[in-house]
Amino acid sequence: MALSFFSGGGSASHAKYFDIRLDEDYIVFRGGEQEAASAHLSGKLLLCLSEPLSIKHIRLHLTGISRVCWHLPSSSAGGGRKSWRERVIYEKTWRFRDPGKGKTEILPAGNYEYPFNLVLEGNMPESIEGLSDTYITYRFKAEIGRKYAKDIIVRKPLRIIRTLEPSALELAHAMSVENIWPNKIEYSISTPTKAVIFGTSIRVDFKLIPLLKGLTIGQIVSQLIESHDLTLNPEDPDSIRNTYKNTRTILNDEFELDHDNALEIIDEAAEGYQFSRYLDLPKTLTRCLQDTDTKGIKVRHKLKFRVQLMNPDGHISELRATLPVSIFISPNLAIDENNNLVDQTPQSAQRAINDIAQQAPPLYGEHQFDQLYSELDPNGYRTPGPGSGPGTPFGTLSRNLSAENLASMNALTNTDISASALHSRLSNLSNLNITRPHQPSPTDHESQNDSEHRRLGVPADYFGPSSGSNSHSPSSPVLSRRPSDEVDHEHVPSGMATPFHPQYAEVETLSRVPSYSTAVRTTKTFPFRHLSSHLSKPISEMLGADLANSSLPWIFFIIGRALVTLTPLVTMMKTEDCDSFKLGLESRIRTEAASPA
């Protein structure tokens, strides 16, 4: 690099090249000061020596300065009063070479490279440049200290940009003002978004519908107004007395309608004017700043509209409206050291607009500066864990087959089923699914039926070949259901375990119908333990000896038992209803018994 970088002396024979080179031309914060993530600043300090050089130190400084100033004119000829305040808002120093106080060292000829990096917090004030006496700037200053000669110094500005996130509401919400001036005009003035990129253009959509016959639209004026609110001591609660406000017009657009060609039908009901205007923003920060509010510098923008209405009687009315606008700097439009856009073509502005509209989320590798939740234990949230293998564990190594942390799960569950019971059921279910089902042979099936008969107290030949049991194939698998006995039912409250149900094989045995000959010969008590105690009485006691010894069909035997079973239920009915019900049923049974079989 040429020696024009140097200020403060030096000769070409001592330093051939000395420069500050940044990896990125500017730092970008996305979002406000309270929500933006940190940013990484990195670069190198390059030094090239053609001959040895005696130095005291090599240092690099980064300094941020805030200055607020305004000039109040005076009525006297002596001028006005000037109020200002300047302060350092950021400082950072890198010491690459430092032999010690009062000492020097000699650098041999050659090339030297000193890397540096820094993490900048997201709440740092952004760069504000463009006003003459009010600004926030960041500058690098690299110096080579020498004992008997002037220091070699090189400077480089750093621009910090605060832009909007792609999900910001200013980019999604349209701004509009619409109303009806009675007996005058119905109007609607809108912009597609509130936020506008610096250096591009603002599209304004107009819809004007005259409501008075003979009323015509005159000149339409659109203005972009920039307001400045400056405060010397923003952190001082009494700083209202040290505040200065000022406004300036950024652009002015005047337009007149072509009444012969611009009139069209709007909303299928009325005739009016519908058109758009594009307001081109300046390409330099000296004429237009970005919206900001930091360190006592507040900048805002708004659009002001004036529409002349030519009344039929000759007088002129004026429609006035205002819309807020937010201007922000896009990192896709580079700004040089003189605060001008590097590329001022319409194509570059359109590319910046498209990039904002189609911006993707940040890359995975750019998450290292994201703010983490405090007071959150990261154990259990890292995948894989410290002791985890590269693959899914098998068998008992898996968490879903382990019994760890069941006590805490019992405290977290909101249901009546304990976590230990659920774990046991899932484990048994997994074992049942893994085990190959056994297909019983006919011999196994017969032996199982005999054991069921003995357990129920039923004779083995009670269901003979003529009974309904022959409808089941001996080779068909026996239906079974494992009772929920993994928990102690006596010590578990109601609802904590599945109720006990009889085995499917037992129910199947009870549902079989015996043969006719077996039914008429049977007068003993059948100890079916799951039936009501009323069914344990002999037939002679329930229906009488004559009816019991007669050759009744089995269906009447079932009806008689049902009569005795329903006796406790019908006691809730009236006495005469119960008597008539019993007499009618007994009369029908005797009639059927007297008829020939």
From Swiss-Prot:
Superkingdom classification of source: Eukaryota
UniProt gene name: creD
Name assigned to this protein: Probable HECT-type ubiquitin ligase-interacting protein creD
Bias (Basic and acidic residues): 443-455, 482-492
Pfam families linked to this entry: Arrestin_C, Arrestin_N
Signal peptide feature range: none
Cited InterPro entries: Arrestin-like_C, Arrestin-like_N, Arrestin_C-like, Arrestin_domain-protein, Ig_E-set
One GO cellular component term noted in the UniProt record for this chain: plasma membrane
Single GO biological process annotation from the record: ubiquitin-dependent endocytosis
Role this protein plays: Component of the regulatory network controlling carbon source utilization through ubiquitination and deubiquitination involving creA, creB, creC, creD and acrB. May be involved in signaling by recognizing appropriately phosphorylated substrates via its arrestin domains and then recruit a HECT-type ubiquitin ligase such as hulA, leading to ubiquitination of the substrate, providing a link between ubiquitination and phosphorylation in protein regulation and stability.
Gene3D superfamilies registered for this protein in UniProt: 2.60.40.640
Keyword annotations from UniProtKB, A to Z: Ubl conjugation pathway
Transmembrane segments: none
SMART domains, per database record: Arrestin_C
GO function terms (MF aspect): protein-macromolecule adaptor activity; ubiquitin protein ligase binding
Similarity section: Belongs to the arrestin family.
Subunit structure: Interacts with hulA.
Annotated spans, Disordered: 375-398, 432-499
Residue ranges, compositional bias (Low complexity): 465-481
